[in-house]
C-alpha cells in the first residue's frame, strides 16, 4: 500500500509518501509545499492545492492520512490552517483518494505507542521505521511521515478486526 501522509499548514504543508508492505516500511518521497507569507491568502491556498494535486498525480497513492487541526489560541491561524486542510482534502478527493484523519494523540500512539510522546521521540521512531540516516526537516515533513506510519498501523488493525468479525472504532 502506498500512503501519503500530510501535515497541513498555510506556510508549510509537510508531505511524506511511504510504502507499507508485509509489515515493512519504505520511504518513497517526502518534502514540503511552501507558500510565501507576503502572498494573498487565496493565492497561497491555490499553491497548496496545486502542490498536493501534483504529488497525488505523480505517485500511485492508495490512501491519504492527514493530521486533524489542533486548535490553538490564535483563531486567525486556526482558520487559515483549516482552509489549507480543505484545499488539501479537495486535491485528494479530485484524484479519487480517500482521506483519513488522525489527532496528534493518535499519531503519537500509532508511531511511538504513547500518546504523550514528545516531538523528538516521534522523530526518532519515524527515522527508525523508515531506515533514514537523519530526521527529515522541517518538522512538518517528519510529522507527515508520522501520520503516514500511523495510518498504516491503523489500517492494518482495522483490516485484522474485520477479518475476525470485530469493528474498529
Curated annotation (Swiss-Prot):
- Record Pfam families: RuvC (PF02075)
* Database matches in InterPro entries: RNaseH-like_sf, RNaseH_sf, X-over_junc_endoDNase_Mg_BS, X-over_junc_endoDNase_RuvC
What are the UniProt keywords, alphabetically? Cytoplasm, DNA damage, DNA recombination, DNA repair, DNA-binding, Endonuclease, Hydrolase, Magnesium, Metal-binding, Nuclease
Keyword Transport assigned: no
Q: Which cofactor does it need?
A: Mg(2+)
* Highest taxon, organism lineage: Bacteria
**How is the cofactor bound, as the UniProt entry phrases it?**
Binds 2 Mg(2+) ion per subunit.
Note the PROSITE patterns from the entry: RUVC (PS01321)
What is catalysed by this protein?
Answer: Endonucleolytic cleavage at a junction such as a reciprocal single-stranded crossover between two homologous DNA duplexes (Holliday junction)
Q: Where does Mg(2+) 2 bind?
A: 67
GO function term, MF aspect, one? magnesium ion binding
What GO biological process terms does the UniProt entry carry, in alphabetical order?
DNA recombination; DNA repair
In this chain, Mg(2+) 1 is annotated as bound at 7, 140
Protein family membership: Belongs to the RuvC family.
User: Tell me, what does this protein do in biology?
Assistant: The RuvA-RuvB-RuvC complex processes Holliday junction (HJ) DNA during genetic recombination and DNA repair. Endonuclease that resolves HJ intermediates. Cleaves cruciform DNA by making single-stranded nicks across the HJ at symmetrical positions within the homologous arms, yielding a 5'-phosphate and a 3'-hydroxyl group; requires a central core of homology in the junction. The consensus cleavage sequence is 5'-(A/T)TT(C/G)-3'. Cleavage occurs on the 3'-side of the TT dinucleotide at the point of strand exchange.
Q: What quaternary structure, including any partners, is listed in this protein's UniProt entry?
A: Homodimer which binds Holliday junction (HJ) DNA. The HJ becomes 2-fold symmetrical on binding to RuvC with unstacked arms; it has a different conformation from HJ DNA in complex with RuvA. In the full resolvosome a probable DNA-RuvA(4)-RuvB(12)-RuvC(2) complex forms which resolves the HJ.
Q: What is this protein called?
A: Crossover junction endodeoxyribonuclease RuvC
Organism of origin is Clostridioides difficile (strain 630) (Peptoclostridium difficile)
Gene name on record?
ruvC
Amino acid at each position: 500500500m502506498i500512503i501519503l501522509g500530510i501535515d497541513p499548514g498555510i506556510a508549510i504543508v509537510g508531505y511524506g509518501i511511504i510504502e507499507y508492505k508485509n509489515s515493512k516500511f519504505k520511504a518513497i518521497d517526502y518534502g514540503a509545499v511552501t507558500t510565501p507569507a507576503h502572498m494573498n491568502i487565496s493565492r497561497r491556498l491555490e499553491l497548496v492545492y496545486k502542490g498536493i494535486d501534483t504529488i497525488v498525480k505523480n505517485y500511485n497513492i492508495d490512501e491519504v492520512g492527514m493530521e486533524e487541526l489542533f486548535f490553538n489560541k490564535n483563531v486567525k491561524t486556526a482558520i487559515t490552517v483549516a482552509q489549507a486542510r480543505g484545499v488539501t482534502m479537495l486535491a485528494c478527493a479530485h484524484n479519487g483518494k480517500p482521506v483519513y484523519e488522525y489527532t496528534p494523540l493518535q499519531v503519537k500512539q500509532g508511531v511511538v505507542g504513547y500518546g504523550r510522546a514528545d516531538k523528538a521521540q516521534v522523530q526518532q521512531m519515524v527515522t527508525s521505521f523508515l531506515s533514514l540516516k537523519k530526521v527529515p526537516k522541517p518538522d512538518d515533513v517528519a510529522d507527515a511521515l508520522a501520520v503516514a506510519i500511523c495510518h498504516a498501523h491503523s489500517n492494518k488493525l482495522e483490516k485484522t478486526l474485520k477479518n475476525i468479525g470485530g469493528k474498529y472504532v
